[in-house]
Amino acid sequence: MSNIRDVAKAAGYSVATISRVLNHPGSVSPATREKVYEIMREMNYTPNTHARGLALDKSNSIALLLPDVLDRSYIKIAKGIEEIAHKKGYFVFLCNSENNADKERNYLDMLIRGRRVDGIIMVNSLLEDRELYALQKENLPFVLAGRKRSLQNINAVYIDYLKGGYQAASHLISLGYDRIGYISNKSCAPEDEEKFSGFKQALKESSLKLHPEYIIEAEKSIRGGTLAAKKMLLETDSPEAIFVSCDPAALAVLKYLDSNNKHIPDDIAILGFDDVEMTELVSPRLSTISFPAYKLGLLSARLLFDDIDNQDYESQEIFLQTKLIIRESCGHGSTAY
């Protein structure tokens, strides 16, 4: 089994340099770090993270707080975070808040009181701004990922959900649809509220009426989408198009309408949000709003470890954009946003 001296010899550096890469990577140039990491991978060398953690008063673990561990987009985010953490020799503790703010607070309380982790990544946190500012005083590195917050000096990677909702409605409007419905997440998650705000903004700019009877809350699931579609069809005048706030529900809407002899998109157009894999496997293929979930995870983890490894670290904000993916479920159109 390889040891640190073997790695130093293969990389052409001193043992002290290898030790700095492992324990204080911020003090070593990126080129040197990458070379050492590559040699470590080639030699299958794994540092003794427990011993290092004891020496440095570190746990060599981070926590990831997710609103829903079954959500495909959150799984992609987790994959990006875990990939970076693994390269750094860190474990990732997964905490599922189930879109419950109190449960999220309980997790944070346990993590902070016991100093069980060296940092935390919070995806679409339900905490209020004042609570996040209070968290800063705990001297525990953390990163906010997902929806935009009006906070200063916070490590964050944001997704513009409002723009995503705006893109969705704008695309449907550009295809000539006037009566447009919206199926939202029943949990009233803040990111879904932002999507709805963008949706309403696009309708207002085009002087289109917002039909309350076409606005339906549903569970973020196949069952939720099915029930919402059923309710939509009970209306005397069905909407011409529907924007669904998540792809699983959108796919369920598509299936239900098809089974009730509604032709997509000729009778009703459907547009989702997330761009999960199944959107390309149904017929017609689902148009959707995509966001770089995996990249969000990667960048969030990098920000967190930069903070953990550097005492003089200054917080950063990174903004990622949504993208309209045009397929067949809305009809033919060449407009992209």
Feature roles, as predicted:
Residues 45, 101, 123-128, 248:
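Short beta->alpha connector loops
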Residues 46-111, 118, 200:
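Amphipathic helical "hinge" segments at domain boundaries
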Residues 127-136:
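Active-site-adjacent beta->alpha loops and helix N-cap segments on the catalytic face
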Residues 1-60, 73:
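N-terminal helix-turn-helix DNA-binding module of bacterial transcription factors
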Residues 1, 42, 80-93, 112, ...:
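Bacterial carbohydrate/catabolite-sensing allosteric modules
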